[in-house]
């Protein structure tokens, strides 16, 4: 991120962030917007399996079981968690919050021989578990220059050979993992300019004309395999002119990508979002006419670095420790910073959920166990216990933004309500039987939706 962009932001954070106090956002109009764009009216007719409508005055309960909106978490990090005895509880806590999961497909992690892909068992287990839970799955990524094997990073291989390998890899992922609903295309494509000029993958990107054209090449290839797939451009710096140019190039050439991913890793003051900054980013990118994903969210529960140079020195210290086999330095999560994390997450999610262009919010590292950059940003601590931020998000996602109703039917088994978009179950007692049915509330609902009720538990 350019220093000229960072400096004005830093000044605005020094007092509040340095003291581990979050200045609560005004959130003016946020609740009204949520009421309008995330909820809708629903008209139902409750019908028994034999075709008879339930009598007028029948008491029923409605419970939302799933959000239409993507509340997501990453399973592409937290590498050590599956080795812990509390891994089952980790999964329970994850499933309690999220209906959407990011799954890792880092090339260099799963391939150590040219031409051979060996997907790790722990990644496969996470993918299968999330799929069984009915979560929407995001593959991360089809391509990323930070995690390519040595034969793709090579400064000596001809571009035509690189092109053959890269495109074969991209096609293989989409073809072999049809259960993945969405894919990050080439993750953080504009960042390739920060790599050595002779790096293989950089030479490959530049041979196609840069981030925009290479996005078109990848999209065209994967659309042949998965015409109805969803494919996302994603970057770490929303104010990077080359990211905006990539999007504009894709739109100009009518490249059929589906959404824009914006990351928000807040490891130093310049990367911490204010209310004004977040709303401005969402407004600016919504003008492109694509759904927005806040694709990687990190809010720290430890002391934050004042600027990128200080964070960079810290990262070098971590790298040096790993090279020499010394313990990796890690900042402590503290109660004050955990409160800061919870309050900022509450406000960040509320404002984002209130913007009509946003369809996904995805938290990055779920636990503080061996955290990325040695800086805890988890919803759970290093022992898998819920932190204040977990409870803050649970209150929003599972209580404030979820519909639970008890009411009575009118004539002909009819009823109506207003609720959050998503999936529902309806339950009522009749003649000693528990009857239950399911339905979805969508932004384009049927005029009247028949819900067939069937015996759930027999008599009792």
Feature map (PLM): residue ranges:
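Bacterial N-terminal signal peptides
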Residues: 7-16
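Beta-strand-rich domain onsets/edges
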Residues: 21-78, 112-113, 138, 152, ...
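Aromatic- and acid-rich polysaccharide-binding/catalytic face
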Residues: 95-108, 113, 180-187, 191, ...
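Substrate-binding cleft and catalytic face of glycoside hydrolase catalytic domains
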Residues: 96, 100-116, 123-231, 236
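Bacterial N-terminal signal peptides that target proteins for export
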Residues: 1-7
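Alpha-helical scaffolding within the catalytic cores
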Residues: 58, 79-92, 121-126, 168-173, ...
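Short Pro-Gly-centered beta-turn/loop motif in secreted/extracellular proteins
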Residues: 83-97, 415-423
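Aromatic-rich peripheral "rim/lid" segments of glycoside hydrolase catalytic domains that contact
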Residues: 184, 189-221, 277-291, 300-459
């Amino acid at each position: 991120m350019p220093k000229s962009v960072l400096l004005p932001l830093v000044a605005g954070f020094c007092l509040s962030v340095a003291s581990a106090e979050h200045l609560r956002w005004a959130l003016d109009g946020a609740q009204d917007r949520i009421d309008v764009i995330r909820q809708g009216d629903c008209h139902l007719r409750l019908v028994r399996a034999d075709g008879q409508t339930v009598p007028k005055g029948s008491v029923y309960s409605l419970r939302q079981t799933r959000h239409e909106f993507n509340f997501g978490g990453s399973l592409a990090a937290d590498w050590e968690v599956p080795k812990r005895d509390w891994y089952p509880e980790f999964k329970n806590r994850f499933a309690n919050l999220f209906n959407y999961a990011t799954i890792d497909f880092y090339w260099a992690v799963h391939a150590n021989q040219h031409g051979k892909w060996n997907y790790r068992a722990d990644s496969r287990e996470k993918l299968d578990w999330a799929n069984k839970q009915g979560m929407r799955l995001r593959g991360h990524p089809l391509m990323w220059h930070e995690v390519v094997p040595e034969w793709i990073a090579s400064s000596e291989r001809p571009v035509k050979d690189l092109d053959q390998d890269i495109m074969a890899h991209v096609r293989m992922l989409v073809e072999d993992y049809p259960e993945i609903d969405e894919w990050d295309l080439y993750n953080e494509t504009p960042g390739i300019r920060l790599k050595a000029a002779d790096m293989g993958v950089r030479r490959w990107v530049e041979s196609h004309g840069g981030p925009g054209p290479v996005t078109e090449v990848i999209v065209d290839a994967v659309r042949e395999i998965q015409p109805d797939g969803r494919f996302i451009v994603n970057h770490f710096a929303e104010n990077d002119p080359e990211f905006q140019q990539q999007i504009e190039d894709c739109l100009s050439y009518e490249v059929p990508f589906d959404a824009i991913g914006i990351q928000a890793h807040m490891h130093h003051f310049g990367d911490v979002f204010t209310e004004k900054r977040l709303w401005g980013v969402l407004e600016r990118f919504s003008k492109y006419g694509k759904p927005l994903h806040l694709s990687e969210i990190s809010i720290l529960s430890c002391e934050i670095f004042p600027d990128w140079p200080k964070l960079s020195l810290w990262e070098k210290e971590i790298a040096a420790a790993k090279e020499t086999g010394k313990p990796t330095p890690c900042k402590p999560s503290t109660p004050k910073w955990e409160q800061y994390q919870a309050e900022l997450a509450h406000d960040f999610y509320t404002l984002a959920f209130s913007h009509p262009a946003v369809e996904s919010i995805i938290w990055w590292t779920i636990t503080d166990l061996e955290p990325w950059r040695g800086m805890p940003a988890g919803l759970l601590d290093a022992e898998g216990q819920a932190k204040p931020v977990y409870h803050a998000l649970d209150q929003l996602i599972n209580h404030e933004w979820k519909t639970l109703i008890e009411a009575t039917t009118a004539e002909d088994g009819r009823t109506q309500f207003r609720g959050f978009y998503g999936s529902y179950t309806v339950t009522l007692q009749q003649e000693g039987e528990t009857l239950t049915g399911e339905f979805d509330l969508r932004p384009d609902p049927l005029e009247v939706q028949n819900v067939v009720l069937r015996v759930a538990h027999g008599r009792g």
